């Protein structure tokens, strides 16, 4: 039996769980108040606070760090890598702390796991990090040579959904062709073929607008705003990635509240319908990329809990293929199972430095 500690930081909470083989034994979502977090300039500065939350959880459930076979940490914004499970080492930790191109809370998980496990000889792994890059060559072109499209997505949940759906079909991930739409605070819509994410919108910069992100914007207007604005580049980026989308239009990040408002507000109705329209349009594009009818179109993520919203999307796309809805995220299970496959010898963990150099 293998006992695995799973660490998954979110923007305002830290999810921690204990798995024994495939079975989840304990789980906690530790909330962090705005007051706690606002004093930290960078996400990485939160590391001691988040690590203490993990240590407190381990104490609460009656374990010591030495009791674990391995630690599974959510993968951060690393250099582009193929999907899979990677050993966390000093090189990866240094990259996440000092060189990651995006200040993202997911960068904390591997650092926390490594610091907890190393003194006791407990290995730490990341599974399908945010920067999984398996895009086909055609998908990389942006329109100008100086800029290449980047693959930043909800790869962990996307890959977990791919495995789940293919297993239910009695096939391997390499044998199915599916489109996955992960709908959370950010949105990733991707085409999966031969077990790989061959195209995906960058969840920060492209695609549909979401709960708090603008998605793709008209280039001319972005340039005009940037040069006429009194805001710094960092402030503008925050406007686009944390203060845009549904929040900018309706003043709320609560999709249910926005859906309820549709009964009395024409503006709310139009905004929510526009978001569904843009998601459906992105899904249609990914169906085209596959080159043939997909085996399934999967809608997943937090927004998939709202059946009314899902229906708005499926009204557009159901003619493209079978639609399956998997609400929420499979991240904790995906992390644990990715590490379990390595511990059982079913899959080999990769060395991050060897892959990127």
Swiss-Prot record:
Principal cellular location given in the protein's record: cytoplasm
InterPro entries referenced in this protein's UniProt entry, alphabetically: Aliphatic_acid_kin_short-chain, Aliphatic_acid_kinase_CS, ATPase_NBD, Butyrate_kin
Alphabetized Pfam families for the sequence: Acetate_kinase (PF00871)
Subcellular locations according to the entry: Cytoplasm
Gene Ontology annotations of biological process type: acetate metabolic process
Keyword Cytoplasm on entry: yes
PROSITE patterns membership: ACETATE_KINASE_1 (PS01075), ACETATE_KINASE_2 (PS01076)
GO cellular component term of the entry, any: cytoplasm
Taxonomic superkingdom: Bacteria
Reaction(s) this enzyme catalyzes, per UniProt: butanoate + ATP = butanoyl phosphate + ADP
Family statement drawn from the similarity comment of this UniProt entry: Belongs to the acetokinase family.
Name of the molecule in the record: Probable butyrate kinase 1
Species of provenance: Thermotoga maritima (strain ATCC 43589 / DSM 3109 / JCM 10099 / NBRC 100826 / MSB8)
Organism taxonomic ancestry: Bacteria, Thermotogati, Thermotogota, Thermotogae, Thermotogales
Name of encoding gene: buk1
């Amino acid at each position: 039996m293998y006992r695995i500690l799973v660490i998954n930081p979110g923007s305002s909470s830290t999810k921690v769980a204990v798995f024994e083989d495939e079975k989840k034994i304990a789980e906690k979502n530790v909330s962090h108040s705005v007051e706690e977090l606002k004093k930290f300039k960078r996400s990485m500065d939160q590391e001691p606070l988040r690590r203490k939350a993990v240590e407190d959880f381990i104490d609460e459930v009656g374990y010591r760090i030495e009791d674990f076979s391995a630690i599974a940490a959510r993968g951060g914004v690393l250099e582009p890598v193929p999907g899979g499970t990677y050993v966390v080492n000093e090189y990866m930790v240094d990259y996440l702390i000092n060189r990651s191109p995006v200040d993202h809370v997911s960068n904390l998980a591997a650092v926390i796991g490594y610091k907890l496990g190393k003194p006791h000889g407990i290995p730490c792994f990341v599974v399908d990090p945010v920067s999984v890059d398996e895009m086909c060559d055609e998908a990389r072109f942006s329109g100008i040579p100086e800029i290449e499209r980047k693959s930043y997505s909800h790869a962990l949940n996307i890959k977990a959904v791919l495995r789940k759906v293919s297993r239910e079909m009695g096939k391997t991930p390499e044998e199915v062709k599916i489109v996955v739409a992960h709908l959370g605070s950010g949105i990733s819509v991707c085409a999966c073929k031969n077990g790989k994410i061959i195209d995906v919108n960058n969840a920060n910069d492209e695609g549909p607008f979401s709960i708090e992100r603008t998605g793709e914007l008209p280039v001319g207007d972005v340039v005009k705003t940037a040069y006429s604005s009194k805001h710094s580049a960092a402030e503008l980026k925050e406007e686009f990635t944390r203060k845009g989308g549904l929040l900018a239009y309706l003043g709320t990040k609560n999709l249910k509240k926005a859906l309820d408002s549709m009964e009395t507000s024409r503006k709310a109705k139009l905004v929510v319908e526009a978001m569904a329209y843009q998601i459906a349009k992105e899904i249609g594009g990914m169906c085209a990329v596959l080159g043939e009818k997909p085996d399934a179109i999967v809608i997943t993520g937090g927004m998939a809990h709202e059946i009314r919203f899902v229906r708005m999307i499926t009204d557009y796309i159901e003619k493209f293929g079978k639609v399956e809805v998997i609400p929420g995220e499979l991240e904790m299970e995906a992390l644990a199972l990715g590490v379990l496959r390595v511990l059982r010898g079913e899959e080999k963990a990769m060395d991050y430095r060897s892959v990127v150099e």
